[in-house]
């Protein structure tokens, strides 16, 4: 058997990066609900960069040669959502959701499955899950118990570039979105953008950290990879409309409301 049963990409740092985003056999399994994203007209889009804000706490993760991109993008999206919503930063494990979703077999997972998981089970902090865990039987009861404090109360599927950009412009929360990693060189250009290639999304990333106008006049959203801070611009790059629309199969969701932890007295007050 091949050492890498998943498709993989050898990045610019020389590391093998399995591409662990898989699409559901019967199409998207993203849950549906009564919430929607208000569309922000392009004339009102604004540039910003959360990573330059004082106290920005997120650290780029590293899936370390496993197909755990979706688990890590999910954890990053929750960390970003909690910070945007004024909740204290807690580093969350990307291995916790991946171990549950892959069942101990490094076969990848889908974005829709991840949203259903964090709505039902939540996410465990990094302190509760040994790094590199993909066997769910090695997840402790304590990890599951603590994970209930880090659930997604409201998650919204995103189906268009306009919905994605609107969610980001409104600072709704972290967005887990698919992207296509090409077979060739996949490094950023002078604007921080990776090459666009056609095909189904095979990598999951967290976006929503910023927005900028490109030289072409188009727009791009800042995203955080999970290939360590050695990749890209200290682990970051920029996502464009072409990255989204050239995918033949794609998925995305935003964490609209991270659940408030009743044991945490630093939650922001509820405004009636």
Label the model's feature ranges.
Residues 89-103:
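Acidic helix-start/capping segments at beta-turn-to-alpha-helix junctions
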């Amino acid at each position: 058997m091949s050492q890498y049963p998943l498709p993989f990409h050898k990045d610019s740092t020389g590391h093998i990066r399995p591409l662990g985003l898989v699409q559901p056999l019967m199409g998207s399994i993203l849950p549906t609900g009564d919430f929607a994203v208000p569309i922000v007209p392009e004339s009102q889009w604004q540039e910003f960069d959360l990573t330059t804000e004082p106290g920005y706490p997120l650290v780029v993760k590293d899936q370390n040669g496993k197909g755990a991109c979706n688990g890590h993008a999910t954890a990053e999206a929750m960390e970003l959502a909690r910070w945007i919503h004024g909740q204290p930063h807690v580093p969350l494990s990307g291995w916790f959701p991946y171990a549950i979703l892959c069942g101990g077999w490094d076969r990848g997972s889908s974005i829709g499955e991840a949203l259903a998981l964090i709505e039902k089970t939540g996410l465990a902090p990094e302190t509760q899950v040994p790094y590199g865990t993909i066997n769910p039987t090695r997840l402790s009861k304590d990890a599951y118990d603590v994970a209930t404090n880090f659930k997604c109360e409201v998650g919204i599927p995103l189906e268009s570039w306009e919905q994605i950009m609107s969610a980001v412009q409104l600072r709704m929360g972290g967005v887990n979105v698919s992207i296509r990693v090409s077979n060739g060189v996949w490094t950023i250009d002078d604007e921080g953008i990776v090459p666009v290639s056609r095909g189904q999304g095979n990598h999951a990333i967290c976006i929503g950290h910023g927005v900028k106008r490109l030289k072409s006049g188009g727009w791009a959203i800042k995203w955080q990879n999970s290939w360590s801070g050695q990749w890209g611009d200290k682990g970051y790059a920029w996502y464009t409309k072409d990255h989204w629309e050239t995918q033949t199969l794609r998925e995305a969701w935003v964490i609209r409301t991270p659940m408030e932890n009743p044991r945490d007295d630093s939650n922001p007050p509820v405004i009636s």
